[in-house]
């Protein structure tokens, strides 16, 4: 018989050192630990080696407990598994499978009907399973997860950034203006998001980013995006370097598409971030690689996306 493991609830505060240790051991060579990533882990389960003994609190047994804790699965009650990590010394011994099964069951108890890998809840570390973790991709595929598409992150060095020549001309000829949202416009912008891009409403409600607003000739909102930087903008700063920024939730209303509005907004946001002192700018979770490369961004990371029904 193989070694036994018990599963216990994750304590996000007390288990933070455990998360950091497992991350560094299993992922650190490819993904240097983003400290902000650990802040996103609020619910989950821990695998402990050996079935004996009940769980203890802080005290003399902490060192022994750390030696026994070999894996963690994080869950977001809204319906995602943001992270599953197992000590390399205990991989291929059933720990990951046990954690995945327990995490899926826990999400079913929370009332989730479908579960996504990576994103799908209120926040995420990665949109999906990183392409540069091929062992993780194969782990989930071997357990029946079907990856149906791939998304991409892109980056650009904004120091000295110059928008492509003529990028705003078509939008200008169509009478489109692009400005940073002022406070009194907020209700109108939120109504636009709710009607046009409802999946993004939560990101706009956070109030942690600036909003760029495109308006048509009649003054109606035609497009929006979020931009933030250079301070505290992204959990990927350990990889991107200091003074990183982000652009996200780039959306244009259907009647305004094809007029260069999206391109003009991204270029303008890039200029504003450049002028604010942003170095690397990160654009995450998109399938529109050609759109962003034409604006000076280059592919950075790819993620495989999967979703399946939660257990009843």
What are the residue ranges of the model-derived segments?
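Short amphipathic alpha-helix that is part of the acyltransferase structural core
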Residues: 1-35, 46, 68-69, 151, ...
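Intrinsically disordered, low-complexity terminal tails and inter-domain linkers enriched
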Residues: 49-68, 163-167
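Conserved hydrophobic beta-strand within the GNAT/NAT acetyltransferase core sheet
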Residues: 81, 115-117, 247, 281-284
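A short, internal acetyl-CoA/4′-phosphopantetheine-binding micro-motif in the GNAT/acyltransferase core
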Residues: 81-91, 120-123, 247-257
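Conserved acetyl-CoA-binding loop-helix of GNAT-fold acetyltransferases
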Residues: 92-109, 249-252, 258-271, 275, ...
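Acyl-donor-binding surface of acyltransferase catalytic domains
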Residues: 101-174, 306-308
């Amino acid at each position: 018989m193989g070694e036994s493991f018990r599963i216990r609830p994750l304590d996000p505060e007390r288990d933070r050192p455990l998360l950091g240790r497992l991350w560094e051991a299993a992922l650190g060579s490819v993904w240097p630990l983003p400290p902000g990533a650990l802040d996103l882990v609020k619910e989950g389960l821990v695998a402990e080696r050996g079935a004996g003994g009940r769980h203890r609190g802080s005290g003399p047994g902490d060192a022994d407990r750390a030696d026994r804790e070999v894996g963690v699965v994080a869950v977001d009650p809204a319906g995602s598994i943001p992270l599953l990590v197992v000590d390399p010394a205990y991989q291929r011994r059933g720990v990951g499978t046990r954690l995945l099964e327990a995490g899926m069951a826990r999400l079913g108890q929370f009332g989730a009907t479908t579960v996504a890998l990576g994103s799908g809840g209120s926040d995420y570390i990665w949109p999906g399973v990183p392409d540069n973790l091929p062992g993780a991709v194969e782990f989930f595929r071997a357990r029946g997860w079907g990856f149906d598409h791939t998304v991409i992150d892109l980056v650009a060095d904004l120091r000295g950034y110059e928008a492509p020549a003529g990028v705003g001309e078509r939008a200008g000829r169509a009478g489109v203006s692009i400005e940073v949202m002022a406070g009194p416009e907020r209700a109108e912008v939120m109504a636009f998001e709710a009607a046009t891009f409802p999946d993004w409403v939560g990101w706009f409600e956070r109030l942690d980013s600036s909003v760029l607003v495109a308006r048509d000739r009649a003054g109606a909102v035609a497009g929006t995006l979020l931009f933030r930087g250079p301070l505290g903008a992204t959990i990927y700063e350990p990889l991107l370097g200091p003074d990183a920024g982000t652009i996200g939730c780039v959306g244009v209303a259907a009647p305004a598409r094809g007029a260069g509005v999206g391109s003009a907004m991204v270029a303008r946001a890039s200029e504003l971030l450049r002028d604010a002192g942003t170095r690397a700018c990160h654009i995450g979770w998109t399938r529109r690689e050609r759109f962003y490369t034409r604006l000076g961004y280059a592919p950075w990371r790819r993620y495989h996306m999967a979703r399946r029904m939660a257990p009843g």
